[in-house]
Amino acid sequence: MTFGTVLLLSVLASYHGFNLDVEEPTIFQEDAGGFGQSVVQFGGSRLVVGAPLEVVAANQTGRLYDCAAATGMCQPIPLHIRPEAVNMSLGLTLAASTNGSRLLACGPTLHRVCGENSYSKGSCLLLGSRWEIIQTVPDATPECPHQEMDIVFLIDGSGSIDQNDFNQMKGFVQAVMGQFEGTDTLFALMQYSNLLKIHFTFTQFRTSPSQQSLVDPIVQLKGLTFTATGILTVVTQLFHHKNGARKSAKKILIVITDGQKYKDPLEYSDVIPQAEKAGIIRYAIGVGHAFQGPTARQELNTISSAPPQDHVFKVDNFAALGSIQKQLQEKIYAVEGTQSRASSSFQHEMSQEGFSTALTMDGLFLGAVGSFSWSGGAFLYPPNMSPTFINMSQENVDMRDSYLGYSTELALWKGVQNLVLGAPRYQHTGKAVIFTQVSRQWRKKAEVTGTQIGSYFGASLCSVDVDSDGSTDLILIGAPHYYEQTRGGQVSVCPLPRGRVQWQCDAVLRGEQGHPWGRFGAALTVLGDVNEDKLIDVAIGAPGEQENRGAVYLFHGASESGISPSHSQRIASSQLSPRLQYFGQALSGGQDLTQDGLMDLAVGARGQVLLLRSLPVLKVGVAMRFSPVEVAKAVYRCWEEKPSALEAGDATVCLTIQKSSLDQLGDIQSSVRFDLALDPGRLTSRAIFNETKNPTLTRRKTLGLGIHCETLKLLLPDCVEDVVSPIILHLNFSLVREPIPSPQNLRPVLAVGSQDLFTASLPFEKNCGQDGLCEGDLGVTLSFSGLQTLTVGSSLELNVIVTVWNAGEDSYGTVVSLYYPAGLSHRRVSGAQKQPHQSALRLACETVPTEDEGLRSSRCSVNHPIFHEGSNGTFIVTFDVSYKATLGDRMLMRASASSENNKASSSKATFQLELPVKYAVYTMISRQEESTKYFNFATSDEKKMKEAEHRYRVNNLSQRDLAISINFWVPVLLNGVAVWDVVMEAPSQSLPCVSERKPPQHSDFLTQISRSPMLDCSIADCLQFRCDVPSFSVQEELDFTLKGNLSFGWVRETLQKKVLVVSVAEITFDTSVYSQLPGQEAFMRAQMEMVLEEDEVYNAIPIIMGSSVGALLLLALITATLYKLGFFKRHYKEMLEDKPEDTATFSGDDFSCVAPNVPLS
């Protein structure tokens, strides 16, 4: 490679991924009711904003505003609104044609009062580019609905009613009839008691010149109360076409009675079902106190239609009938706005046409949410043709209260137009339905239903052609009231179904968490390609976020899923103005209103509309190259001495800046910043920039479109050990948040999909000789540092000295692998003293698994990445030796040296070494205190025998089982005289013990025993016992007893009075396999000494005779001495006479004594 160049499109926008400018939006504001409720981009340069709640004049609400993007000002659009368009809320819905030549503005709340009812039909204006009204749809204000009613009075004429009350009842009938003058209502009247009389029929009422005079001649019948019979007569006779009843008219029966039926042959159960079947709506008026009881009240409920609270009236007397006259009238009028059991009486009276709209060249689509009792649908108004109503009536689906047409959108597939309608209240979860035209009739093609009650799924729709090929790819369906614990609202991404497959939604878009009442998805719009990736982007409004301040989300188009699942930008109202409310309640995008070649987004808020511009998009290409293309060996190789910084070469960085967006901004001077880093991620970089003397460098420049290059000098400040991996140069590029000199100071962003990090590499020249092929020649040896035998259990560590060398060219990735038995485990590695002119070895060892469970392996990397030619080194690997290890009698350790480029079939690269193995044990034999230790005997006992015993205990204190033998030596014969008749008592019968007679070592026992009065196997014949233990277990304990009769006659032969009888015990094992722990060898042997002592017999007569003669001689000597001293010559008699009678005093030279006067007995 002579020149390395890598190209990168790198990106890190000033606000990463943001494409809409929030620094300087254009804000339109008007003090008009509902301003910002709707907005649409129109004509490529202006916005049309609806203010549907503005009161323009009496009975006229709604106004449109023309807002110019260039000036930021709005002007009311002057329109001539016909007087009958009462309170239509003009501007609640807006739609513009794709070519910008027509605008459709609707007021779906247009009111029309018909009698006591107020109807809401809706009306729309189709406007041209100069605000001229091209068409009004519907073309005329609809007439009040024509409702026919046939009303029958069935009045009680029984005798319980006096004449005055009967006349008041007649006046009530006349008043009610007068309330329906001017309507298509016919009356008939029948009086009942036990007699029945029809006073006038519908035919008579229609033909009578004075309809009021029909009541005056009525005379009370008197009699009983046959109410059930009277109702049956009305049902079968009066509501009959022969009496003028009309088939199309509503049938109403008003029953007026003062009490319960009496002696009537019929029951209500006989007649009420017939009235129900005939579709007669019945009102019951009870007069008087007879209806205070529960039975009477129940009779009124039975007469009336359900529910009773809407069809039963009670008054205290006939004079009070006038108080219910207006209520009855309202109830009857309300029949026109209710639905019966059989069908919906509402058709299009409450349709609210224009609640949603779509504008095409083929006509106008107006959503009619109120049609057919709010089942909903849509009207298509083709040019110069009658309108077509589109709904679900042919699908046999209950759509009552579904609001079909709440939202309207068009979808195109290969030139075929499809209509998509939202029904957010369908079965309380919501639905979206696709209609297509088949044989000039619009039929359902597909539908998808919401999943959560109350979510309002289908409240908003958006048709998206992601790849701009002219066919709709997917439909976005908003469910703004979808509730989750931390967010509110979601938008389903539903690909347009192909063929007859079931319509399904593949993904869901959500706003940020923390906004459970955010109403995400309340408004949707196609934004256009704002990030210049050839895919259409969308915007979604969430006007309820942050306590109804609102926010708008931007989602980019994606080639695979259609729409990216995560938003690229969230614009909170607080970023624009602290006083905004419901920001995002209306959206409109897809046009360039500011004439800069960039798409703009209009966002409606309460009382304001904001125009957000998209930002210009730049593409930045980065190329990096090095000269020379490799770092020379002469630059990076060194030994002990530290080199001064040497030049590694030059790095040239080139930036190519070009525009991605097709804007009208000309040459863009943008402020850019790029950060360079050498060897990022390493603790110490191998190279630095000459300019900064460290591995990082930052540049910030203002650059225009084109190519911009800069050359930087690189230095190597230190010896380089790792010359295998190249020096990495990272470049991080970003645009600085500074406005460009353009209208309103737009800030450019980088193209989406670009990266923000560029990497280039500078390799090192390899030391491969003239042939260009690098081949190492490794060798390795092992030694155990003079250790002759490994004693397991005693040697806790094993040090292995490893020597490795390279006799070839540079070796890359040199590894020494050690293979050893599983009883060893790698502990540490340490380097030996380094050789002159060589740096210390860099070692890193790790244990690696092997397939053989009895074998372990360690890998030690040596001087990674390069073990240079001629290098050698020695290091010590220390292993822990498990005290439980079983290594056999010899341990084998193998070593192999390898690398990425080592010479093949080199015998020096492998080495193996064996070491003898023994196993440390700790066995102990000890004498027991229970043994016989002392005997004394007399000469007379020489022929007697006494039992004696020596006890020994053997313990295994090792960590392993082993086979041992215990030998005992006991003296049994001295010079042919029996000493001890001993036998062995082993701890178990299964333990074999054998005995053997051993002669003495010295025949001259007298000489030996005179030196040491000890009887042992050196002078006596001994009996040797050997007990073999094939498996002496860990912590096992064995007791042995030497027991037998001891003789004393042999002691005379020793010429000694006191002799020690000694037995000896000793443990033996295979010393080629086992070794007693160092310092514990003495515990393998023990001896027991038993003292024998002869008692001496003495003659006492000579002693006694000698003692007696000596005593007599002593007595004679004492007597003679006393005599010479005059002891026997003292005058006791005179001394007694000289004393008083009661006292005797003895005097002498040496003492005196006074005797007390003691009375004599």
UniProtKB/Swiss-Prot annotation:
Signal peptide coordinates: 1-17
Chain positions recorded as Ca(2+) 1 binding sites: D465, D467, D469, D473
Tree of life domain: Eukaryota
Binding sites annotated in the UniProt record for Ca(2+) 2: D529, N531, D533, D537
Keyword RNA-binding: no
Membrane topology per record: Single-pass type I membrane protein
Residue numbers binding Ca(2+) 3: D592, D596, D600
Pfam family, one: Integrin_alpha
Keyword Calcium part of the UniProt annotation: yes
Record-linked InterPro entries: FG-GAP, Int_alpha_beta-p, Integrin_alpha, Integrin_alpha_C_CS, Integrin_alpha_Ig-like_1, Integrin_alpha_Ig-like_2, Integrin_alpha_N, Integrin_dom_sf
CDD domains reported in the protein's UniProt record: vWA_integrins_alpha_subunit
SUPFAM superfamilies referenced in this protein's UniProt entry, alphabetically: Integrin alpha N-terminal domain (SSF69318), Integrin domains (SSF69179), vWA-like (SSF53300)
GO BP term (any one): integrin-mediated signaling pathway
Topological domains, Extracellular: 18-1099
Cytoplasmic side: 1121-1161
Keyword terms: Calcium, Cell adhesion, Disulfide bond, Glycoprotein, Integrin, Magnesium, Membrane, Metal-binding, Receptor, Repeat, Signal, Transmembrane, Transmembrane helix
Expression sites by tissue: Expressed moderately on myelomonocytic cell lines and subsets of peripheral blood leukocytes and strongly on tissue-specialized cells, including macrophages foam cells within atherosclerotic plaques, and on splenic red pulp macrophages.
GO annotation, cellular component aspect: cell surface; external side of plasma membrane; integrin complex; plasma membrane
Glycan attachment points: N59, N87, N99, N391, N690, N732, N872, N956, N1045
Renumbered ranges of motif GFFKR motif: 1126-1130
Any one GO molecular function term: integrin binding
Subunit composition and interactions: Heterodimer of an alpha and a beta subunit. Alpha-D associates with beta-2.
This protein's domain notes: The integrin I-domain (insert) is a VWFA domain. Integrins with I-domains do not undergo protease cleavage.
Reported function: Integrin alpha-D/beta-2 is a receptor for ICAM3 and VCAM1. May play a role in the atherosclerotic process such as clearing lipoproteins from plaques and in phagocytosis of blood-borne pathogens, particulate matter, and senescent erythrocytes from the blood.
Protein name: Integrin alpha-D
Organism listed in the record: Homo sapiens (Human)
Organismal lineage: Eukaryota, Metazoa, Chordata, Craniata, Vertebrata
The encoding gene: ITGAD
